[in-house]
Amino acid sequence: MKELVFLKFGGSLITDKTQPYTPLLDRMDDIALQIATTLQTQPNLRLVIGHGAGSFGHVAASEYKTRAGYPRPSPLMHRERDETEENYWKGFAEVWYQASSLNRYVMKALHKANVRAISLPPSSSVIATEGKVSVWETTPIRMGLSARIVPVIFGDVVFDEIRGGTILSTEDLFMHLARALSPERILLAGLEAAVWEDFPARTKKIEKITPRTFDEFSRGIGKSEGADVTGGMKSKVAQMLELVQYNHELSVQIFSGTEPGNIVHTLTGETLGTVITMS
């Protein structure tokens, strides 16, 4: 029986988020090899990969406030663009360039490991409305999965009907794609071994989060270390809780991608880190 899994490796896992534009190439290679190994031994696994922008996209996005957007003028207005608007769109293009640059490193690692993967940039296929996906032509993703190709998406700039432009994280994209494709599992690999009740002390691991228990943990769940314009850990958990309430059969894991073999272990069904489920 075929199983569809979404796997994200966070920007903090594949870049040094404290050093702008610094890819962690050895780690990318290791992750790619783990994915290749798993696909060879699990012929029924269908995989969609997403990755964060790390120290590539987040630096420029923070400088230019790209996620907040710049409201579109009426098409009936004839006016010169002011300096603020010019600067916004300059930043929009810069974030696109940096996010795409990181994606090339990821794709190189996957292809070096003989993973049949293709990049499907959200900037060329997604339209947002007020920071959420409103239009996405997902047929290439579906056809890729049918051909046993691994579609790769990533945190990217997109045009927005209200804001003009914005940034969508991989989790933002998964929010839409999970409703369209109904994966059995979503795996979020990062630096943290789990979600912590007392971040940044990291002494109280949360084994499981459900909609009923989230409130008791939410105060201690922290943001990400380093630049992150898309919300950090608490935002990720909240988004995944929304998805498990939409699809009660969905299971989400948040775990460390730095430990040897963890990608293989989770892809093949082992439970690591923190689990998010409906009950």
Residue ranges and their predicted role:
Residues 262-279:
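Short, basic/aromatic-enriched C-terminal tail that caps enzymatic domains
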Residues 1-262:
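Nucleotide/pyrophosphate-binding catalytic subdomain
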